[in-house]
Amino acid sequence: MLQEKLDLLLTKYEVGKSAGVAKTSDGYTLEIGGKSVRLLPHRFERRFTELRKMLSDGTVTGISAVRCSNISPADIPLESVIRREIDLARFVTGREVVSVAAFGNGNRAVNLLAVLEGGINAIIE
């Protein structure tokens, strides 16, 4: 389905390059012009875009912490869950990660404490 939509857009906008969408263990990857780009569809979920908008337009101010939580099926690699949650913290706040401390229990549970630019703490479970 994604490939069909991609082909439609490439034709519509006359890109002139062939492209493909590949399913990987941690989501989807776009292959175009010899380059591979990871797709981040979670950034377009309304709840995250609205939260980002409230932070950027000043509706919410003085943020000191962000908390993210995720419970995923066992077949989804923990690394991809961590990557997604850190990306969400970065996306919503508009700040980059400065440092991370991780505490885990095997390969299925982890707590991350990340410090973002400006001293914002991100707690990821």
What is each of the regions a protein language model found here?
Residues 66-125:
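Rossmann-like dinucleotide-binding domain that binds NAD(P)(H)
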Residues 2-75:
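A contiguous active-site-proximal alpha/beta segment in oxidoreductase catalytic domains
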